[in-house]
């Protein structure tokens, strides 16, 4: 054993570059694998942290052809079902803030910060199993109470006096308008990152929209009684009057039902607030992780096999001295295991360094060796198994020849040895090609979505996030006046939403001649369409007087609605959710304020909605064409700080806002791109290492060829030809696999790019070029050597 190890260290030292590269590739592969397994743990364990996760369900509203769509609900059926369904133990409304609200902790010196508190019922803590470190939720039946997370309490009150302290607000909370300050009555343990209720602030739900069966603004969660199944509760819901009493515009076609909380993440699509994932993505990540490990394992097998001719004499000497094949093979497998475990330990150091450098945000979660320690240990077990598997064939191979054969020739360069290496390297090329093509198409689809025509002049629009106060208040008037005095500002419009930042907005339904038409409803100022660069296709634009509150609302709709309904401009609509009528003043071109993953839904813009309370906290600032955007940004920021002193404000380019919709796809693209590049890099490391050995063992052949007149270029082509052919053949074999994977991924988008053959050809060319460059760099010196030296040494 000592002799074998001594010979191994001598060989590794002799081929130092190849040895270091192989170990680096192994370490990088396991670092990628550890990170991917952490991500898989995050995905796999989503919403499993609750004490009664198997009894926690969400109430949803099924619609025709939208069974997997998470719908907002009216409050009426939520309260009704909590009282009427015997299988429900506890129930809570789960109401989003819809807008950020400004709070402060010191009334004498207000320093404002924005938060989005969720409104819940007093039983919320029992339903999801909150653990309180201080106080409790017993006071959550009082309107001026609030519970906060432990980390948030430390952030707001570093001295530890959070319990009993107050959060103040100047703008009444819309779900609880009588509350202008909130007393912290409980501090709960932070919930894990991979759960739906990861929020820092929960307030009591007021009396807003009680007994309202039409306005859809809420979500709801129930805790079922022990032993009661989801199917039983759904039967109990169907037996009530809830579905008949719904007044959401699609009577008779909708159905209330509950679904397990864990189904929300994996099987539902939610445009609002809730996190969603997919099992196919998790499968893809697992596959990528194991493929990278397999590539590294193949490198190790090739590396060990290539070392065989150098080590064969020592191994056969051990046979002569009495060592059995079994003993030698166990020792060689132990070597392989040791190398892999060293690589695994180095990979943990790499992961720790990457976490410390904070460069893993694209992973979509917070990696941690401590939090995911179980999965880190699992990767260690896999490393052990990898070492055993990678060592089995080389150990058998190096001990399988009689001494006479060892003295006669070089099996490593025989036909059978070459075929083995060709198959192993070919597999690496197939995996690398498929991953790179997949990453390329994901990049192209993301670029297509980001550059898609939105129907507005996005390049001339800046969006400012302002405090929640009426837009005709004194600070807003000052802000508006000062900005318009700047020569580069064309005009300013205001809206309730940061359009383009979310997958959906307030949805309502109106009735016209007995038919119901759904739409996304946006509160705006009368100049909004002009500022955004929309074009009036029929009818007329808003007049300034259209913003006056009357019993008649004023609408402008997008062309989608006209194509769907054929309602002429100027008609009166029955806006029954509010018990009002509305005048459809005109139509504008279609606009895209959601991602291309969602279907097209008409938009309606209204300047005199009764529920906006004139609070339109997003300013859409149109900059004149050709203006200096940096100068405009500087002026806007300065004006915001002067007009809204103490309030946190923000201004963005519209592209920044719209890009948030594709953050998940962007992260996915980065994951696949980086790990695809790693896969091809590890493959090239393997090729590089084999070229070193092949060049070393073919020095005599090279010398003879040089003596007979072969040029340096011919020698390089002799090495590169087989690898070039292999890369092209493997690219052809991998193309159907990559095409299938991409076509399946693209199915989630309503508008998508074509699968162009040029991407496959360019990827093949890039891989072939990189391979040739690698071969040329490594073999150039060998090809240039004096043949006399090569023949003399041989």
Where are these regions (language model features)?
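Generic structural signal for small/hydrophobic residues in well-ordered secondary structure
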Residues: 12, 22, 43, 59, ...
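Mid-to-C-terminal secondary-structure elements
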Residues: 118-133, 146-277, 481-661
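Membrane-helix entry/capping segments
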Residues: 1-5, 10, 14-18, 50, ...
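Membrane-proximal extracellular/periplasmic loop immediately following the first transmembrane helix
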Residues: 36-101, 209-210, 215-222, 234-235, ...
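Small-residue-rich transmembrane alpha-helices
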Residues: 31, 35, 257, 336-403, ...
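Intracellular coupling helices
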Residues: 5-21, 25, 296-339, 400-411, ...
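Hydrophobic alpha-helical transmembrane segments of multi-pass inner-membrane transport and secretion
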Residues: 14-42, 277-313, 340-341, 420-445, ...
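Alpha-helical transmembrane segments
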Residues: 21, 28-55, 358-363, 431-459, ...
